[in-house]
């Protein structure tokens, strides 16, 4: 039977629906479903004052205005659902964004697959001396990176072997030793390392997705979550191109400047030589402001 729909569809998104987009070594993102497009945002905004459909350039201008002035409700009219496979340690960071509906693969009911994440040597670096939550920019020497990878792989394989031994079952659920009862899956899973992969369905509205992407596609975000965010940016661009363009203009490539920062800029425009000491800003604020202006 031929399927028909009266709802808005986006051809560029229909093309990738259900298709896995590879991320990291064993991860992926799949678009499972979506609701709305750029026109749904415009429709929601215009109902506030009863105006009809406008020209595309006016729609684009309205979306720019809404995003620029932090109007949020119209963007909440669009939803998207993803199927995502990701390392457990990234899932725990990801779930800090509490504005999505999530259902995760349960290692209480099922046996977790034998797939774990190993970083590329170029992404193995020491702890930053400046930022307490991230790595340095320079990679470890080849020998150091190889040692790290060997330890990570050995630990993951050993723990998965013990995981199966504790359950007395292989990854397909087959009994290993008929004379051993094993322990419950909900207990055996505690021994697995955090680089093992989990999966979940993640449904979120566009407003909250953009907030997630603003933080996680940022160069300061951890590499392993940033690569997922970068793939999602490509999906958003295909789904809502006007919104993506406005988001890139006002959020990704734009900047928020404090009152003191604006005062510094005004003084500089007038020809005054402003220094950190005379700015009234903290060292970090001053450095961030100077970075904005190159």
UniProtKB/Swiss-Prot annotation:
The pathway it acts in is: Pyrimidine metabolism; dTTP biosynthesis
Keyword Membrane belongs to the record: no
**Which cofactor is recorded for it?**
FAD
**Active site positions, chain numbering:** 216 (involved in ionization of n3 of dump, leading to its activation)
State the Gene Ontology terms under molecular function.
flavin adenine dinucleotide binding; NADPH binding; thymidylate synthase (FAD) activity; thymidylate synthase activity
Tell me which residues make up the ThyX domain: 27-250
Q: Which UniProt keywords apply?
A: FAD, Flavoprotein, Methyltransferase, NADP, Nucleotide biosynthesis, Transferase
Q: Where does FAD bind?
A: 73, 96-98, 104, 205-207, 211
Q: Which reaction does it catalyse?
A: dUMP + (6R)-5,10-methylene-5,6,7,8-tetrahydrofolate + NADPH + H(+) = dTMP + (6S)-5,6,7,8-tetrahydrofolate + NADP(+)
Question: What's its job?
Answer: Catalyzes the reductive methylation of 2'-deoxyuridine-5'-monophosphate (dUMP) to 2'-deoxythymidine-5'-monophosphate (dTMP) while utilizing 5,10-methylenetetrahydrofolate (mTHF) as the methyl donor, and NADPH and FADH(2) as the reductant.
Subunit and interaction comment: Homotetramer.
Give the protein name, as stated in the record: Flavin-dependent thymidylate synthase
Organism of this sequence? Rickettsia felis (strain ATCC VR-1525 / URRWXCal2) (Rickettsia azadi)
């Amino acid at each position: 039977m031929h399927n028909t729909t009266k709802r808005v569809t986006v051809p560029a998104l229909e093309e990738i629906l259900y298709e896995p987009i590879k991320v990291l070594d064993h991860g992926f993102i799949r678009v499972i479903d979506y609701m709305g497009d750029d026109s749904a945002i415009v429709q929601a905004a215009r109902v506030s004052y009863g105006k009809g459909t406008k020209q595309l350039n006016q729609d684009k201008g309205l979306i720019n205005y809404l995003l620029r002035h932090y109007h949020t409700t119209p963007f909440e009219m669009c939803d998207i659902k993803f199927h995502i496979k990701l390392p457990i340690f990234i899932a725990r960071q990801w779930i800090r964004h509490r504005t999505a509906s999530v259902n995760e693969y349960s290692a209480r009911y099922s046996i977790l697959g034998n797939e774990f994440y190993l970083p590329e040597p170029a992404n193995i670096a020491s702890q930053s001396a400046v930022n307490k939550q991230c790595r340095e920019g320079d990679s470890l020497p080849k020998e150091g990176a190889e040692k790290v990878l060997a330890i990570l792989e050995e630990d993951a394989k050993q723990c998965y072997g013990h995981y199966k031994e504790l359950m007395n079952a292989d990854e397909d659920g087959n009994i290993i030793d008929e004379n051993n009862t094993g322990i419950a899956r909900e207990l055996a899973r505690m021994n697995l390392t955090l680089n093992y992969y989990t999966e979940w369905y993640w449904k979120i509205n566009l407003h909250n997705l953009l907030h997630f992407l603003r933080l996680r596609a940022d160069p300061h975000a951890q590499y392993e979550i940033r690569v997922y965010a970068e793939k999602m940016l490509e999906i958003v661009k295909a789904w809502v191109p006007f919104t993506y363009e406005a988001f890139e203009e006002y959020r990704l490539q734009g900047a928020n400047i404090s009152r003191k920062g604006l005062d510094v800029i005004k003084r500089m425009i007038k020809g005054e030589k402003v220094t950190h000491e005379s700015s009234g800003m903290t060292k970090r604020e001053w450095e961030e402001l100077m970075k904005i202006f190159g």
